[in-house]
Every structure is written in C-alpha cells, then in structure tokens.
Amino acid sequence: MRVVFFGTPEFALPSLQILLQPQSPFEVVGLVCQPDRPQGRGQKVLPPPTKILAQAHGIPVWQPGRLRRDPEVLAALEALAADVFVVVAYGQILPPAVLQMPKLGCINVHASLLPAYRGAAPIQWAIANGETETGVTTMLMDEGMDTGAILLQAKLPIEPEQTGLELASQLAQRGAELLVETLVKLEKGELTPIPQDDSRATYAPLLKKQDFQLDWQRPAQALHNQIRAFSPDCFTGLQGQRIKIVRSAAPQLHPPPAELPPGSPGEVVGLARGEGVYVATGEGSLLIRRAQLPGRKEQSACDLVNGGQLRVGMRFEVLPDP
C-alpha cells in the first residue's frame, strides 16, 4: 500500500514510525509537514520531528506554507499515485482536490472519541473539562473539520493527575496502533464507515493565552484540571510577578486537612510538608506542588517556601493583562 503521510509534531511520530517499521506492508512515498519554524526560548529555526525521521529514511518531504495554494506540491502529490493519504496532526486543512487524490481516501487519526472534541486541542480540553475517559478515532476525511465518517475507535482512561503531555504520549502510541489496524482492514474491505452524529458534537478550539490564566474564584477541582491540561503553561500573579503553576494535586486524592483555615480565593493558607502549599479557591483548597518564577527553572513549591519566595498569607491574583 502506497502511503503519503501528512503530519508535523511529536504526536505524529509514532504513526509515521510504525508505518516505517521493517517488514511493514506499507510504503511511505512522501511526507507533507509544516515549514521549519522558530522554537523555544532561543527561537532557533528547527525542522518538524516528522521531517527528521522521513529524511533519515530517504523519503521526499514537502513543506508548503499554504497547501491549497501551492500548485507544485499538489502536482507532486498527484504524481505519487498513492493508495491512501494518512493525516496525523498536520496543521492545515486539506483542500477538496487533495481529498480526492488517493484511491482509498484520506485517513485521519484524531485524539478524541468523535464526535466529541472536534478541533485543534482535543486532549487538553478533555482534561480541562474533567473527563475521565477519552480515546482515538480513525476517520475517513471529508471537507469539514473532523466531521468525517468513523472507521475505528479505541478508548483510554484519563487518570486524576495525568497532564496533557502525558496523555498525548499515550494517545499518540495508541493512535499509531489503531492506524495500522485501520489501513489493513481498509485494504481488505472490512470496514464500514459510520457517519458521525452531529447532534452529539462538542468542540476543542485552538488554545489562547487567556485559557492559561488561573482564576482562583473557580473550584479547586476545576483549577486542578486546568493546570494539568495545559501544563506547564498555566500562570497567575504573585506580588506583581507572573508565576507559572506547573503541578497540582487532585483534590479527591489529597484533600486539605480539616484544621486548614478557609482563606480567601488565591491565598496560601497552609503548608504540606514534603508536598507543597495549599491555596484557597472558590470551592475548597488546592495543593500546589510545582511552580516556576520568572527567569527561573521549575521548582517544587516546598523549595520556594524554603527560599522565602512563597509563604502562608501570600495571595495569588488574576493578572489584568495576560
């Protein structure tokens, strides 16, 4: 089976790797990914992980800025005469002309149990919304945003303290396995695409800076879900500085001691030896385990207490201009 792979970030790597395994029945004849972009604090221009892997295997790579407006790339894709296009976190919408090219269609690996969490950030929003289960879906792509007919699905539990990055790693691996199963069954004609029930659709929009700001008026559980979903990017104000809250503890697993004072939302109300600090919220108190001060490396909350940067009575606050 001749495959063109569309994918860019780390999440796409396991799917590309499994197609490239020795004795694989699949022949990857091309990779399409996003252009090299500045990354990290140094803003060094780096290639996508999928590009590095493809080039190591001698696979041709295309990196159009706008696929639908690049006639040379479109012509090259047509000339490859692929049986199927596989799309895993590519980062662009495939135009109708591309969707119609491969004989068996375009197969997408999406990190949710569609029709739930259509969109760009399904992993993070599932955690932020307090879901206890998610999964991966392979679907036959159409012109809509994650609206194609479902081929196969696999469920995974979301653990109470699991972060978005941790869950993404699991889903990427499970998605790769499901992709192989999908392609094998598709070639044999053993799959019946099932249309999605649009009435049950929910959405996972692209993340914005405001999504990372912590509002201590919210309940402890909601804040914990937000912190782990978007880790390590959630932030709050502390004495005029912007501080990142990297890790918290699940309230149901680490309830505050009965003698802990209630405090006002955002106030550091107690210490947990070897664990962190308790912060009052709109409903209950939340145990904060790890944080990061401006210009510093991530530290345990206990180290911040020992260093005098954090103490009982201090108050986290919403920043006016995140």
UniProtKB/Swiss-Prot annotation:
The top EC class is transferase
E.C. number: 2.1.2.9
Per UniProt, where does (6S)-5,6,7,8-tetrahydrofolate bind? S112, L113, L114, P115
- Taxonomic superkingdom: Bacteria
Record keywords: Protein biosynthesis, Transferase
Q: Does the keyword Phosphoprotein apply?
A: no
Q: Name any GO cellular component annotation.
A: cytosol
Swiss-Prot/TrEMBL catalytic activity: L-methionyl-tRNA(fMet) + (6R)-10-formyltetrahydrofolate = N-formyl-L-methionyl-tRNA(fMet) + (6S)-5,6,7,8-tetrahydrofolate + H(+)
Q: Name one GO molecular function term.
A: methionyl-tRNA formyltransferase activity
Family the UniProt entry places it in: Belongs to the Fmt family.
* Function as written in the Swiss-Prot or TrEMBL entry: Attaches a formyl group to the free amino group of methionyl-tRNA(fMet). The formyl group appears to play a dual role in the initiator identity of N-formylmethionyl-tRNA by promoting its recognition by IF2 and preventing the misappropriation of this tRNA by the elongation apparatus.
Its name, as the record gives it, is Methionyl-tRNA formyltransferase
Please name the gene that encodes this protein. fmt
